[in-house]
Design a protein with these regions (language model features):
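Short, surface-exposed coil-to-beta transition loops
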Residues: 73, 112-114, 146-148
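C-terminal partner/receptor-binding element of secreted or periplasmic proteins
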Residues: 156-201
């Protein structure tokens, strides 16, 4: 089991409501979000500014803060490009979306924790996350942690996409590198990442 610690321009369907866990406060759930097929491809995405130009991965002289492949076969990487500077990259053989800047946050949970890094593209936010939450609270039994990495996409506060890493070589968010390259926020950027738990059990 891969432990924490050491986004996929996507608009995929999202899971519906399920029981809350300690990862966040109780809140009402809406109907499952299903994005149109056309939304799965980038539209008017910013031109890549990556120093690599033709690959999504981090260069040897960059800090690999996060990296994984999603079910579509495309990759997400967050690479530290300089002091207090980093990029979010998504694409297949070449970058389709590159975003700079970002902020990060982390919280501890009983039996785990979560880190998030957020990048903005207009009103759309890409929140990369690495989380581990306890799913079994029976005395004397294993915690049965749910471990997930991925990206959740929000338009304002509306969830419009969620996709999980599908890669044995996933590099979860590195807390030390995130601290070195991003300003820290006091709270997580979204509690909706608990949707991932229902897809990994």
């Amino acid at each position: 089991v891969r432990a924490l610690p050491a986004f996929t321009l996507l608009l995929a369907s999202c899971g519906g409501g399920a029981a809350e866990n300690e990862a966040g406060p109780a809140r009402e759930r809406g109907k499952p979000v299903v994005a149109p097929a056309a939304a799965l491809s980038p539209v008017a995405a910013p031109a890549p500014t990556s120093p690599l130009g033709n690959t999504v991965g981090c260069a040897p002289d960059e800090d690999r803060i996060f990296s994984c492949k999603v079910a579509s076969g495309k990759r997400i990487a967050i690479c530290g490009t300089g002091e207090r500077d980093a990029e979010y990259r998504f694409g297949g053989s070449t970058p389709e979306l590159v975003l700079r800047g970002g902020r990060w946050a982390s919280v501890p949970y009983s039996g785990g924790g979560e880190a998030q890094i957020v990048f903005a593209n207009g009103t759309t936010r890409y929140i990369v996350f690495s989380r581990m939450v306890r799913t079994n609270f029976a005395a004397g039994e294993p915690n049965n942690p749910a471990i997930s990495d991925g990206v959740i996409v929000l338009d304002g506060e509306k969830v419009i996409g969620l996709q999980l890493c599908d890669d044995a070589d996933t590099v979860s968010i590195d807390y030390d590198l995130a601290e070195a390259h991003f300003p820290r926020a006091d709270e997580l950027f979204s509690w909706e990442t608990d949707r991932a738990d229902r897809r990994t059990r």
